[in-house]
């Protein structure tokens, strides 16, 4: 059996521009592509944290070190400059590959420079203010004890 698994993601990147009159795709800084193991032409899902939009497109390499995350074509109706997005690539793997594979998770700063690399898809960097599902039972217990 084959399974579709998260291969890599760039988490909370800031959209630098959106161009409606482009042929499509998302332009991504080549440094981020390398960190996330993305290839030009590879399919990605873009999740807009600000408005909840989800869309699929493909990656085009942007200038290395530029921090570019450019939304191109019709997707510019859904995702605007300044929006925070998650870019997710999936891979189809057999059972053995699933057990051996470690995804690439790239957290970026406000300038879209990588600040943390990892393999845990549910990890939240310390000090980020993000909540990981692995913390929910602890948070629920803290909330309950504060109500008593």
From Swiss-Prot:
User: Listed GO molecular functions?
Assistant: aspartate 1-decarboxylase activity
Q: Name one GO biological process term.
A: pantothenate biosynthetic process
Residue positions where Pyruvic acid (Ser) is found in the record:
25
- Reported modifications of this chain: Is synthesized initially as an inactive proenzyme, which is activated by self-cleavage at a specific serine bond to produce a beta-subunit with a hydroxyl group at its C-terminus and an alpha-subunit with a pyruvoyl group at its N-terminus.
Q: Which cofactor does it need?
A: pyruvate
The intrachain disulfides are: none
Q: Which residues bind substrate?
A: 57, 73-75
UniProt keyword terms in alphabetical order: Autocatalytic cleavage, Cytoplasm, Decarboxylase, Lyase, Pantothenate biosynthesis, Pyruvate, Schiff base, Zymogen
Pathway it acts in? Cofactor biosynthesis; (R)-pantothenate biosynthesis; beta-alanine from L-aspartate: step 1/1
Compartments in which it is found: Cytoplasm
Q: Which superkingdom?
A: Bacteria
| Annotated cofactor note | Binds 1 pyruvoyl group covalently per subunit.
Primary location: cytoplasm
Under which EC number(s) is this enzyme classified?
Answer: 4.1.1.11
Instruction: Please verify whether the record's keywords include Cytoplasm.
Output: yes
- InterPro entries xrefs: Asp_de-COase-like_dom_sf, Asp_decarbox
Reactions this protein catalyses: L-aspartate + H(+) = beta-alanine + CO2
Cellular component terms, GO, for this chain's entry?
cytosol
Catalytic residues at 25 (schiff-base intermediate with substrate), 58 (proton donor)
* PANTHER family in the record: ASPARTATE 1-DECARBOXYLASE (PTHR21012:SF0)
- Protein function: Catalyzes the pyruvoyl-dependent decarboxylation of aspartate to produce beta-alanine.
What does the similarity note say? Belongs to the PanD family.
* Record-given protein name: Aspartate 1-decarboxylase
Q: What's the source species for this entry?
A: Rhodococcus jostii (strain RHA1)
Q: Which classification does the entry list for the species?
A: Bacteria, Bacillati, Actinomycetota, Actinomycetes, Mycobacteriales
């Amino acid at each position: 059996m084959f399974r579709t698994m998260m291969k890599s993601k760039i988490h909370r990147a800031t959209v630098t521009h959106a161009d409606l009159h482009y042929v499509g795709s998302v332009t991504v800084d080549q440094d981020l592509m390398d960190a996330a193991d993305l290839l030009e032409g590879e399919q990605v899902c873009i999740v807009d944290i600000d408005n909840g939009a989800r869309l699929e497109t493909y990656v085009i390499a942007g200038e290395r070190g530029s921090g570019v995350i450019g939304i191109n074509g019709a997707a510019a109706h859904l995702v605007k400059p300044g929006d925070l997005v998650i870019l997710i690539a999936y891979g189809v793997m057999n059972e053995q590959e699933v057990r051996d594979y470690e995804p690439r998770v790239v957290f970026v700063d406000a300038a879209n420079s990588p600040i943390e690399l990892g393999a845990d898809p549910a990890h939240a960097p310390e000090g980020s203010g993000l909540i990981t599902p692995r913390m929910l039972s602890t948070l629920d217990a803290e909330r309950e004890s504060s109500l008593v």
